[in-house]
Amino acid sequence: DVYNYGKMKRDFTYIDDIVEAVVRVQDVIPQANADWTVESGSPATSSAPYRVYNIGNSSPVELMDYITALEEALGMEAKKNMMPIQPGDVLDTSADTQPLYDLVGFKPQTSVKEGVKNFVEWYKDYYQI
């Protein structure tokens, strides 16, 4: 089933970009936020020394573009059952990665087409199909 007729947008992020971000962040020791309080605190910081960062491509892609990239990489057309949007679903989501970029100067860049192609090649090689 393809909901909202494939018109929803999602932030697809290639695994190598995620690994690169984690590697860059691992050596940055977070500092406690002395101004943090339960009442006014952000879930990304606290009085304990930790930080939470979004790792994403920050470039939402229509679901149909993702499906098309998969079809091209596999060399076959998917059987698609187009459906209306489901109650409670959202049309567009993406990650705010500015804090990550500000910290380590990294923003994921791998396109959906390139990432899907790389994944399909890896999958076929790994499973010898």
Regions found by a protein language model. Give the residues of each.
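C-terminal substrate-binding subdomain of Rossmann-fold SDR/epimerase-dehydratase oxidoreductases
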Residues: 1-129
